[in-house]
C-alpha cells in the first residue's frame, strides 16, 4: 500500500500538516497518479524548483507557483537572464535537494508577522496584498521557505519523477502594465513510467503543433501589421473550413435549423439590456458612430433574439431553431493568444433554440444526437459535464429543477458518460459542456449546451400558448464545435495534419512524370473537380518525379496520382493512398466515381 500524503474532505484537499492542525478527517489520498495526489505532488515540486532557483540565484524573488492542467509553474524574478539550457541545471539541483529528504513543515503566522518576515521581498508583499485572510501560512523545507496555502508532501524524498518543460515570460498578476516575470513550467508524477509516457506525448505534441503544421501546409497565417490574434485563412485552410461548413450546413438543414444573420456591431444600449455591458465589457471592443456608442458583438445571442422578436410567436411555431456561423470579437490579453486556439476574432457554429419548457428534453436529445454524429465522423472520444445551479442565480426553483432534470435525463437516455459540476452552472441556467479527447489523450473543451432563463426575461420574449396567454419561452444556446478556429486547431493536432479524405484541403494531387503528360493531367483535374466535387491540384513544377512526390507527401495529400505515358494511353491510373498506406490502379472513371462516393458517404 502506498504512503498516505493527504486527506480529501468535502471536495477539498488537505495535506497531513493542515489536516492535523484543523482536526480534519476524510478519505485518504495515497501517493499515486490520482488527480488529488498529483495536485499535492506538483505543488511540492513547484516549491522544490523554487528552492533550487534560490540556491542558484540567491537574489531570486518569487510570486506564485500554482498547479495547472499542464503540471505546475512558478513566476519569479532574478537579475540574470535564464534560458532553456538553464532548465537542466535547475533540474539537477532539484534532484540533489530532493535526495536530502527534507521534511516539509507548515508554520501559521498572523498577517503582521508575515508582513514583517517578508518586508524586503516586493513580490511576497504583492502576494499578501491579494490575500484577505488574517492568518497566513508558510511552508519550509531545509533552509527554504515560502508563503503558501498548500497542500504539500510530507518530505522532499518523494519527489523523484519530474521534468521542467518550458520557460516563458509572464506579467505580474496577469497585468500587462505590471513588470514582466520569468515563468518556468514543469511536470511531476508518482512513478517513472508515467513521466516517460507524458514526455513522449509532449514531443509528439510538438510535431503536431497546429501552428507549425498550419504554416507547413499553408492553412493560415498571422500578420503583425494587421494585429495579434486575428487569423488570416489561406486558400487551403479556407477549403478545409468550407468542407466542414458544408457538412454542417447540410446536417443543420436536415435537423430543422433556419439560417439567420445578425449585425457585427450593435448599439451599446442593447448590450446594457442583455447584461453584457456590465458583466463582459472588458472583453468587448467599442466604437462611436454619430456620437452613439456601439459594441462589436462578442456573442451572437442578441442578434438571434431580435430575429425571434421580428414577429409575434405562437406555441405552434415552437421550437424555433436559428443558426449562424457568427463572427465574434473578444478581447484577449496578448500573453494568452495561442495560434488558432486563442484568438481575438473567431467564428462560432452558433445556434439558439426558442422552445417551451416541456420541449427542453427533446431538443437536448437532438443536440446530443447531432454531437454524436460529428464526433464519430472525426473519430473523437468525448464526455460531457453537467453544471448545476450556483448560489447566485435567477429564476424560480421549479424551472431550475425541471431544466436540470431534462439535461440529466437526456444524457442518461443517450448513454453518455458525464460528470457533475455542482454549482458550476451559469447564473441564468444549467449547462452541458462537451469535452473531446484527441489522439494524444488530451482533453479539449469545445461545445456547450446552455439553458437560459435570463435573456428571455430581459428582452421580455413571449409566445401565445394554446389558452391565448403570453408565456416566456426558454432559450437554449448551442455550439457543438465551439468555434471553427479552435476546432480546426484541434483537428490539425489530432490528425497530425493527415486530415481524412472528406475534409482534406487538397484531396487529390496529380503528378505528371513529364511535359508530355501535362495536358491529360489538366483535363483529368478538371474532371475530378466537376464530377466528384473533390479538390484536385496539379503538380506542374519542373522538378524530378521523386521531388514532386516528396512535396505532395509534405502537404499530406490523401491521394497521389502519378501519370506517365502508360496512364495517358490506357486511362488506368496509378494511385498512392497515404491514409491506407497502399498503392493500386483504377480506371479513370472508376476512380472519379469512387472518390465521389467516399467524400459523400460521410455526414453529420
Curated annotation (Swiss-Prot):
Please list the GO terms describing molecular function. ATP binding; metal ion binding; threonine-tRNA ligase activity; tRNA binding
Q: How cofactor binds (record note)?
A: Binds 1 zinc ion per subunit.
Question: A GO biological process this protein is involved in?
Answer: threonyl-tRNA aminoacylation
Instruction: State a single Pfam family of this protein.
Output: tRNA-synt_2b
Which GO cellular component terms, listed alphabetically, does the Swiss-Prot or TrEMBL entry include? cytosol
Catalysed transformations (reactions): tRNA(Thr) + L-threonine + ATP = L-threonyl-tRNA(Thr) + AMP + diphosphate + H(+)
Q: Where in the cell is it found?
A: Cytoplasm
**Region (Catalytic): which ranges?**
209-500
Q: What is this protein called?
A: Threonine--tRNA ligase
Amino acid at each position: 500500500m502506498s504512503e498516505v500524503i493527504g486527506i480529501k474532505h468535502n471536495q477539498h484537499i488537505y495535506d497531513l500538516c493542515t489536516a492535523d492542525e484543523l482536526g480534519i478527517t476524510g478519505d485518504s489520498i495515497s501517493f499515486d497518479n490520482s488527480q488529488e495526489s498529483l495536485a499535492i505532488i506538483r505543488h511540492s515540486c513547484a516549491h522544490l524548483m523554487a528552492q533550487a532557483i534560490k540556491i542558484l540565484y540567491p537574489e531570486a524573488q518569487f510570486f506564485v507557483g500554482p498547479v495547472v492542467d499542464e503540471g505546475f509553474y512558478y513566476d519569479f524574478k532574478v537579475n540574470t537572464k535564464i534560458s532553456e539550457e538553464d532548465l537542466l541545471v535547475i533540474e539537477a539541483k532539484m534532484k540533489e535537494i530532493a535526495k536530502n529528504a527534507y521534511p516539509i513543515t507548515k508554520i501559521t503566522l498572523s498577517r503582521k508577522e508575515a508582513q514583517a518576515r517578508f518586508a524586503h521581498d516586493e513580490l511576497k508583499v504583492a502576494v499578501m496584498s491579494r490575500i484577505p485572510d488574517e492568518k497566513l501560512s508558510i511552508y519550509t523545507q531545509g533552509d527554504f521557505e515560502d508563503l503558501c496555502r498548500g497542500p504539500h508532501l510530507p518530505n522532499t524524498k518523494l519527489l523523484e519523477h519530474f521534468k521542467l518543460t518550458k520557460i516563458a515570460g509572464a506579467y505580474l498578476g496577469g497585468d500587462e502594465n505590471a513588470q514582466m516575470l520569468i515563468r518556468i513550467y514543469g511536470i511531476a508524477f508518482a512513478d517513472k513510467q508515467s513521466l516517460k509516457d507524458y514526455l513522449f506525448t509532449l514531443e509528439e505534441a510538438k510535431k503536431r503543433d497546429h501552428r507549425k503544421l498550419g504554416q507547413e501546409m499553408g492553412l493560415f497565417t498571422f500578420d503583425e501589421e494587421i494585429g495579434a490574434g486575428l487569423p488570416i485563412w489561406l486558400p487551403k485552410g479556407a477549403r478545409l473550413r468550407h468542407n466542414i461548413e458544408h457538412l454542417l450546413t447540410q446536417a443543420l438543414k436536415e435537423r430543422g435549423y433556419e439560417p439567420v444573420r445578425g449585425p457585427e456591431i450593435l448599439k451599446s444600449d442593447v448590450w446594457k439590456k442583455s447584461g453584457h455591458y456590465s458583466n463582459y465589457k472588458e472583453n468587448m471592443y467599442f466604437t462611436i458612430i454619430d456620437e452613439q456608442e456601439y459594441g462589436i458583438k462578442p456573442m451572437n445571442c442578441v442578434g438571434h433574439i431580435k430575429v425571434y422578436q421580428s414577429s409575434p410567436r405562437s406555441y405552434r411555431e415552437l421550437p424555433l431553431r436559428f443558426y449562424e456561423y457568427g463572427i465574434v470579437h473578444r478581447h484577449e490579453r496578448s500573453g494568452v493568444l495561442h495560434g488558432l486556439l486563442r484568438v481575438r476574432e473567431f467564428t462560432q457554429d452558433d445556434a439558439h433554440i426558442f422552445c417551451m419548457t416541456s420541449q427542453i428534453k427533446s431538443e437536448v436529445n437532438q443536440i446530443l444526437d447531432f454531437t454524436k454524429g460529428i464526433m464519430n465522423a472525426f473519430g473523437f472520444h468525448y464526455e460531457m459535464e453537467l453544471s448545476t445551479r450556483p448560489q447566485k442565480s435567477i429564476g424560480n426553483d421549479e424551472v431550475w429543477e425541471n431544466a436540470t432534470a431534462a439535461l440529466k435525463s437526456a444524457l442518461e437516455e443517450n448513454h453518455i458518460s458525464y460528470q457533475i459540476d455542482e454549482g458550476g452552472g451559469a447564473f441564468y441556467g444549467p449547462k452541458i459542456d462537451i469535452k473531446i479527447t484527441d489522439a494524444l489523450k488530451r482533453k479539449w473543451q469545445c461545445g456547450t449546451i446552455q439553458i437560459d432563463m435570463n435573456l428571455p426575461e430581459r428582452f421580455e420574449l413571449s409566445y401565445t400558448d394554446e389558452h391565448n396567454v403570453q408565456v416566456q419561452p426558454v432559450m437554449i444556446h448551442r455550439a457543438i464545435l465551439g468555434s471553427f478556429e479552435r476546432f480546426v486547431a484541434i483537428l490539425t493536432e489530432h490528425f497530425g495534419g493527415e486530415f481524412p479524405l472528406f475534409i482534406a484541403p487538397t484531396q487529390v494531387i496529380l503528378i505528371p512524370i513529364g511535359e508530355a503528360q501535362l495536358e491529360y493531367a489538366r483535363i483529368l483535374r478538371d474532371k475530378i473537380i466537376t464530377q466528384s466535387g473533390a479538390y484536385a491540384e496539379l503538380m506542374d513544377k519542373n522538378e524530378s518525379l521523386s521531388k514532386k512526390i516528396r512535396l505532395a507527401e509534405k502537404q499530406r495529400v490523401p491521394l497521389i496520382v502519378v501519370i506517365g505515358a502508360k496512364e495517358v494511353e490506357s486511362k488506368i491510373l496509378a494511385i498512392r493512398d497515404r491514409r491506407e498506406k497502399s498503392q493500386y490502379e483504377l480506371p479513370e472513371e472508376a476512380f472519379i466515381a469512387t472518390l465521389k462516393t467516399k467524400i459523400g458517404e460521410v455526414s453529420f
